[in-house]
Swiss-Prot record:
Lineage: Bacteria, Pseudomonadati, Pseudomonadota, Betaproteobacteria, Nitrosomonadales
UniProt cross-references to PROSITE patterns, sorted A to Z: RIBOSOMAL_L2
Function: One of the primary rRNA binding proteins. Required for association of the 30S and 50S subunits to form the 70S ribosome, for tRNA binding and peptide bond formation. It has been suggested to have peptidyltransferase activity; this is somewhat controversial. Makes several contacts with the 16S rRNA in the 70S ribosome.
GO cellular component: large ribosomal subunit
Presence of the UniProt keyword RNA-binding in the record: yes
GO BP, sorted A to Z: cytoplasmic translation
Quaternary data: Part of the 50S ribosomal subunit. Forms a bridge to the 30S subunit in the 70S ribosome.
InterPro entries xrefs: NA-bd_OB-fold (IPR012340), Rib_uL2_dom2 (IPR014722), Ribosomal_uL2 (IPR002171), Ribosomal_uL2_bac/org-type (IPR005880), Ribosomal_uL2_C (IPR022669), Ribosomal_uL2_CS (IPR022671), Ribosomal_uL2_dom3 (IPR014726), Ribosomal_uL2_RNA-bd_dom (IPR022666)
Protein name as annotated: Large ribosomal subunit protein uL2
Region called Disordered, residue ranges: 36-55, 223-275
SMART domains reported for this sequence: Ribosomal_L2, Ribosomal_L2_C
Keywords from the named record: Ribonucleoprotein, Ribosomal protein, RNA-binding, rRNA-binding
One GO MF term attached to the UniProt entry: structural constituent of ribosome
Length: 275
């Protein structure tokens, strides 16, 4: 992987920094693993905005990714590494010995031709998927399940990983990149190694239009709006909000806890904000 700074042929190109991955597949994705992707533009079933700053963007197909990795004992060969517009990580196309093909999140350092396998008896090697009970303590893993058989939910973005700290009875303790330590059942599966495309965070898209291509709309400050649009709006000239920062719907935005599901709190050993 390499970072390339683009020649400043225009104001929009001046700040562009690209991440170039040699060996990335240049053809089309596998049609059998594509699904149509409808854009919600941040609206709910009533057409009301529930997530701001979303809308537009280039039309995309969704790549069906195998997050369960439940095809045990059958070796698979990495056919190619592909770009995925729906996520920051790259995808690896696996061809199993029985002929089935599946996409997975490409681990760091994986190459075309590598042999991978899933299951309890899989060797300890980057890219192989095993239950947490079979992974050595201290290992770095990614694509971790939170419930057995549900599919990976933790550490799926580019460059992310989780460390297996300990195993106590039916649960394993994981340290997340945020600093949070949480318990996960030992039957949950995880993939050894880190997610690939680790230099993704070093790129610079360079201009506002590149955000619009990605379906991201502008973020407008509340203090420059009218009172009908935002609690911070109104006033003559440049004025402060006049209150503690809130969302357009009046919810405090700094330090206010909005998490309501208390049933899963017992799985969190150490919170990410703990000192």
């Amino acid at each position: 992987m390499a970072l390339i700074k683009v020649k400043p042929t225009s104001a929009g190109r001046r700040a562009v920094v690209k991440v170039v991955t040699p060996g990335l597949h240049k053809g089309k994705p596998l049609a059998a693993l594509l699904e149509p992707k409808k854009r919600g533009s941040g609206r709910n079933n009533n057409g009301h905005i529930t997530v701001r700053h979303k809308g537009g963007g280039h039309k995309q197909h969704y790549r069906v990714v195998d997050f369960r990795r439940n095809k045990d004992g059958i070796p698979a060969k990495v056919e190619r590494i592909e770009y995925d517009p729906n996520r920051s990580a790259h995808l690896a196309l696996l061809c199993y010995a029985d002929g089935e093909r599946r996409y997975i999140i490409a681990p760091r350092g994986i190459a075309v031709g590598a042999q991978l396998v899933n299951g309890v008896e899989a060797p300890i090697k980057a890219g192989n998927c095993l239950p947490l009970r079979s992974i050595p303590v201290g290992s770095t893993v990614h694509c971790v399940e939170m419930m057995p058989g549900k599919g990976a939910q933790i550490a799926r973005s580019a460059g992310t990983s989780v460390q297996l700290l300990a195993r106590e009875g039916s649960y394993a303790q994981l340290r997340l990149r945020s600093g949070e330590i949480r318990k996960v059942h030992v039957d949950c599966r995880a993939t050894l190694g880190e997610c690939g495309n680790e230099e993704h965070s070093l790129r610079s898209i360079g201009k506002a239009g590149a955000s619009r291509w990605r379906g991201i709309r502008p973020t407008v400050r509340g203090v420059v709006m009218n009172p009908v649009d935002h609690p911070h709006g109104g006033g003559e000239g440049r004025t402060a909000a006049g209150r503690h920062p809130v969302s357009p719907w009046g919810t405090p935005t700094k330090g206010y806890r909005t998490r309501s599901n208390k049933r899963t709190s017992n799985m969190i050993v150490r919170r990410r904000h703990a000192r």
